[in-house]
A protein has these predicted regions:
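Short, flexible, surface-exposed loop segments at domain boundaries
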Residues: 2-5, 10-12, 17-195
């Protein structure tokens, strides 16, 4: 269930602006079979197919880890899935704290694909407050700002993404690889090591 949630939601969240969209985009969850300086071989979680990807020279290595609401601070660049409830306000259902290198990725607020009353917001935290027992996170993005309600629910997942190096990507590691397919083959420019 957790993997399905992450798979469904992070596609829009982490897609790089320069990355090709549609059928040419690579977004694969799997386990590393082997890796060297120029390629990474991944066994896909979806069906178990094994595929070799070229590693782009400017590849970004990311480590994903569990975090807490208290880890979020002013000026952090974050992403929030949220649902608009009966009170008309956006209540976060999942939060992610990005590294500085990821600042600006997917920035803005938009409806989630085929999800009724759900939105994805990638924005900079400008402050927090407490209203009716819930934290309210204020965020700003180009062309707008928003209040996100952080209900006191321990089941709301929070993740932190930090920069790492190729040394974190070893055989047996759970990863998410992103990139693009073209006439020259499949190349990844982002490798995220999953918990």
């Amino acid at each position: 269930m957790r993997r399905a949630l992450i798979l469904g939601s992070l596609i829009a969240l982490l897609a790089a602006p320069a990355m090709a969209q549609g059928n040419n985009a690579i977004n694969v969850f799997g386990v590393v079979d082997k890796i060297d300086a120029s390629t990474v071989v991944v066994k896909n979680d979806d069906g178990g197919a094994v595929e070799t990807f070229k590693i782009a020279p400017n590849v970004l290595y990311i480590q994903q880890a569990a975090a807490k609401l208290s880890d979020i601070k002013s000026n952090d660049f974050v992403a929030s899935e949220a649902v608009r409830k009966e009170d008309g306000k956006l209540h976060s259902t999942e939060l992610r704290i990005f590294s500085e290198k990821m600042r600006g990725i997917g920035e803005g607020q938009r409806p989630m694909n085929d999800a009724k009353n759900q939105t994805m917001t990638n924005a900079t935290v400008t402050g927090t407050a407490i209203t009716n027992g819930s934290n309210v996170m204020k965020v700003k993005f180009p062309g707008g700002e928003s209040d996100l309600i952080l209900d006191p629910d321990p089941n709301i997942p929070v993740f932190k993404f930090t920069d790492t190096t190729a040394s974190a990507v070893t055989a047996g590691a759970k990863v998410r690889v992103q990139g693009v397919r073209n006439a020259e083959g499949a190349t990844v420019n982002r490798i995220t090591v999953m918990p």
